[in-house]
Amino acid sequence: MDTWLANEQSDDSSDDGEASGDTEMDFLRNLFSKTLGISGEKVLDELTLEGVASYIQSGKCKNIICMVGAGISTSAGIPDFRSPDTGLYANLQKYNLPYPEAIFQIDYFKKHPEPFFALARELYPGQFKPTVCHYFIKLLKDKGLLKRCYSQNIDTLERVAGLEGEDLIEAHGTFYTSHCVSFMCRKEYDLDWMKEKIFSDDIPKCDKCSNLVKPDIVFFGENLPKRFFTSMAMDFPRCDLLIIMGTSLQVQPFAALVGRVSNSCPRLLINLEKAGGADPLLGIISIGGGMDFDSAKAYRREAITFT
């Protein structure tokens, strides 16, 4: 697994010819730095994992946010979604779907729930154990350093590792609870109830109204939990270290979270590939728009790689 650091400011300087041609851009960057209150003071002593560890131990780092995706659970035996040969979407032929994503489409589910619940039997929480990544996040909590963990995962392994509901924002929902799909009912069911139904080959139906019961995972066509948005607005301005692990950062609005920390907040990406690239338009003025690892003009970010 590779590691990239997106830090607050680069010490690199352009040669004289290039610098003279970028006078206007430098002026704009300086203007935005002053306007936005971006400090030129370095946060990390060095752009290495040792530098990050030193910062965490310094006492200055008190509000760490982790953003995690399916990549932190693959070593537990749970497939990710998009890997070409081993990913979930590449291995759904047996369900005779019109297209792979249909298994997580709410309209398709209401008409054809069988494929989803067949898949759920294979991936159901309780069959897998947390990985070192999950326990690292729990360690941050135990040390009083974790502000919140924002997870795209529905496998509940963060909870198994010891995180409480307050520690977690399960952006794409969870198997932990389920609800009747009827807006007139919405009766809630717990994990054990759903597990019994799934492993008895029954399509879960509501005891009260006989409509389908669906785990509280977010399907395509459904809104993200309200708590995702309310917590996001409170948490990210206070974040002083953002750790991103095991996500391609392709799904919005989760992917946009990387741009919500302050411009002085170090961002550490631990991934098999670079992700969360900067938006070209916002990148011109060096604010927001994701992470810029490769641009020669990047004033805020540098990258290092470990294999």
Model-derived features: positions:
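Conserved catalytic core of sirtuin-type NAD+-dependent deacylases
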Residues: 1-307
